[in-house]
């Protein structure tokens, strides 16, 4: 039965591709049946940061003196060509693409001691207009990637001591809130970005009191890190209220 369903699905996708060809989000070329979101060439050329392999990155160092970070992860550099992937996700409701990239990042973060994943909150007006909070999609994708990495490790066989360290993070969407409508940060200069998010975020005490965040390792996620103003503001609120460790993850990073 499963072979029949697989054959039927492949046939359906083949017909759908003929009627409604899928395009690579970077170059616009028609995708082959086995390709997803990116053509093979553009996927191979994805400008990975490899931040998950070392700590002292330029983006990580830029937070010195502002907030103490455990780690900073970004999947790829926000280049002229590959920013189209972020735009497709955020502004054209390509939620599957955002989840796909986030899961890819989560698999690279791999097994860790992260307890909670907190997405940067979106103002209700912007969420209503867009229909979703992109950071929440990213958070769920990263979690799925980490779970997949844990599953692979368990299949390989690990000791009982190691199993105790296999932590499956929980996504928390009600801990931080956004009380100030700030508009887009895209066209703003560095100092404008900082002023734009000043007092924009607030701790949702009703949501936070359900969880003991003291002593926990929290991963804050967003789509792109540029100056770090938004992520810095969120991290400061958490560290001012809880004795917690903070890491940051984004799909893309401006060089």
Task: Report the location of each language-model feature.
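Glycine-rich phosphate/pyrophosphate-handling loop used in enzymes and phosphotransfer proteins
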Residues: 1-255
